[in-house]
Amino acid sequence: MKYDTSELCDIYQEDVNVVEPLFSNFGGRASFGGQIITVKCFEDNGLLYDLLEQNGRGRVLVVDGGGSVRRALVDAELTRLAVQNEWEGLVIYGAVRQVDDLEELDIGIQAMAAIPVGAAGEGIGESDVRVNFGGVTFFSGDHLYADNTGIILSEDPLDIE
């Protein structure tokens, strides 16, 4: 499904929170949306592997990487796992790498920057916790919509059709 965050903001202005414009699109989908699962991890993506092995149909993984752009939390291997398990998208408050590969994969990815250095894989972090970045607080179960214009968040699903 295609999402237009500008139109959604016009229709649901009182019902959505708009994430500050810190992110760029690195994935093969220009827009994506779904119910979110939150993760908090710093320069370590081991927990992301565990979560992205789950069925992701209709879901978006929101990762609070502390805004660090020293190490990439997401690479092509991890993204292929997400695609295989039908995740709608990833929002990374941090960095990604292997961007030429990422843009070829059928998934939405919004992240702050790209860097070639990979993250540790020890599995340090927490999931299903409140995370806050970009002027918005994210809770697992909220609904996120993203496109090349921006990212918006709603407690309830928006009537898109």
Swiss-Prot record:
Q: Which GO terms describe its biological process?
A: negative regulation of RNA catabolic process
- Membrane in keyword set: no
Q: Give any Gene Ontology cellular component.
A: cytosol
Q: What Pfam families does this protein map onto?
A: RraA-like
Q: What does this protein do?
A: Globally modulates RNA abundance by binding to RNase E (Rne) and regulating its endonucleolytic activity. Can modulate Rne action in a substrate-dependent manner by altering the composition of the degradosome. Modulates RNA-binding and helicase activities of the degradosome.
HAMAP family (alphabetical): RraA
**Name the UniProt record assigns to this protein:** Regulator of ribonuclease activity A
**From which source organism is this entry?**
Escherichia fergusonii (strain ATCC 35469 / DSM 13698 / CCUG 18766 / IAM 14443 / JCM 21226 / LMG 7866 / NBRC 102419 / NCTC 12128 / CDC 0568-73)
